């Protein structure tokens, strides 16, 4: 069995880790970075860019550059959070046929957020494969603890589209606790809080780490959060401030200009990061827009105090879930041994101050907020793969699960913060005389009224024997697996007729859609491989042409005119072939040129005493590595 890799699929950045020699380690991507921007871009020539290359070209291609799609995954288009996001992103968000929030490119190509996330997961998969030197097919992927069933299913689907068998979905704070807890050599029992404020989501979990019969047990006591609170919201506050200040000064609303908005987003994110270590920064965007009077420049000073005032309510919004989680765990702040900060936004001093004030203790600074979650996912992968022994993880379901009963009431069958995996059953009856079928409406949430909770699925149990209302007994059973994904069954206790359903929410992708997306991803991988091979053939041909022309100039007089004529003809043929996309043709014409110029290359080699670089006929082969590196650099420059 191959390695089970750990992936932190983040809103802003993603990270991949593996178990290596008994320790979890983060793997650097092809650019040498330990995290990868969760950004996917579609270029005019049909190329798909992922990560840093996608981020670099975002300013010039805002409508086809997709970021923060994790905030859309598993959500309906009509969700208030999605509607709020539409105003802040330059790309198009629209409703799919089933009501899900999808995205679209400027030429109308519609895609599910799962497809975009799959591209990021593919990049993580490739990063691990390059490091390990073997194929990777299995992964543990992290999600916010407060993700509901639809969002967890959607994340698993993204993994499938990327060609990964997702062995486990694990909550981000729990993963961070694993990374932190295993790093501690002692066997001391401790209760910790993981405060996870990432790019798009916020979670807080209260976790007990205990040594039970030589086994390190991580038990989640309570979790809470907000799946639409994160660094993106902090950035948006800065963007809104800059837009308003510029409008006051110049009378121009930059919200109507996608290019300007994308430049503002980059500048706002940079300014926010700078203000974690500086008291003041300057946002300077020359030629940000233009009107009839000419180009306009944006130059605005931003202080740390102003930034803190802009986001004060967002920071306060993160404290209430901390209070609820502590209360649900039956603990006080004084019972907590340590507070761990996870997520890039926790680097902000004001956030750290708020956490310190609430819990009455300084949060730990020895945990890398960008990498802890991926490391924990890799450890869980090691547990599942048998590489990590004596570790037991007991997670919880973040929200209550139940069904709608008479009068639109939400009846809970599994309470929030119940340790998973778990099963629970409850017996219900009919509401009408001689009722032959019941509809089971499965919901997730905390509100007493069913309509205010998240609808997960509806299914019918038919064939109930006619009887007065209240007599038939229908047993509804809920079964949550270790991924936090729900299976529901309803059984008529008299006839033993049963209806089972693995919750595939009314939102979400059908099996047919997933199969199509998997096939598309496979086709694209093959296409990318062919593209790289074509580029390599072109680069080798280009080096051969350059070497041949040099040989003609320096040594052409030593061979007959007929040889030069053949070489010139072969050169022209190769240059024509290079304008096309036929790799075989380019290789054939390259070979023809090498054969036509054999005597020329021999003369050049003899004249130079076989000096390095004189063998023009092997120019393409000898310099493969150099040419490839040059190609990569040129490509990036073109896209940025």
From Swiss-Prot:
Modified residues (Phosphothreonine): 201
Annotated InterPro entries: ATPase_NBD, Chaperone_DnaK, Heat_shock_70_CS, HSP70_C_sf, HSP70_peptide-bd_sf, Hsp_70_fam
Keyword annotations: ATP-binding, Chaperone, Nucleotide-binding, Phosphoprotein, Stress response
Keyword Iron-sulfur: no
Region (Disordered): 603-625
Assigned protein family: Belongs to the heat shock protein 70 family.
NCBIfam families: PRK00290.1 (NF001413), PRK05183.1 (NF003520), prok_dnaK (TIGR02350)
Matches recorded under HAMAP family: DnaK (MF_00332)
Protein name: Chaperone protein DnaK
Organism from which the protein derives: Stenotrophomonas maltophilia (strain K279a)
